[in-house]
Regions:
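Ribonuclease/tRNase effector modules and their secretory precursors
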Residues: 1-80
Length: 80
C-alpha cells in the first residue's frame, strides 16, 4: 500500500493513531460497501467489530494509495 503525505500527517492525531494498519488493509481488500466519489476517489467501509464502528478508507483514483482513514460516525451500513 502507498500513502499520501496527508494520510501520514493525519495518522499522528490521537484519534487516528488508534486505527490499526491491518484494519485499513482489510477494508481496502474486503470492504462491506464502496462508492466512487465524483473526483474519482474510492470510498470503502468495513465494520470493525472490535470497535463496533465502520472504518472509512479513501483511496486515490489509482486504487492503491490511501488518502484518508477514519471511523465514520454517520455511516450505518447503507450505500451512500
Amino acid at each position: 500500500m502507498k500513502f499520501t503525505q496527508y494520510f501520514l500527517y493525519m495518522r499522528q492525531r490521537p484519534d487516528r493513531a488508534k486505527i490499526k494498519m491491518e484494519w485499513i488493509e482489510d477494508t481496502v481488500k474486503n470492504p462491506d460497501c464502496e462508492t466512487i466519489q465524483l473526483d474519482g476517489r474510492n470510498r470503502k467501509w468495513k465494520k470493525i467489530e472490535e470497535q463496533g464502528k465502520f472504518l472509512r478508507v479513501v483511496l486515490l483514483p489509482d486504487g492503491e494509495t490511501v488518502h484518508n482513514a477514519f471511523f465514520d460516525r454517520t455511516f450505518k451500513g447503507e450505500t451512500k
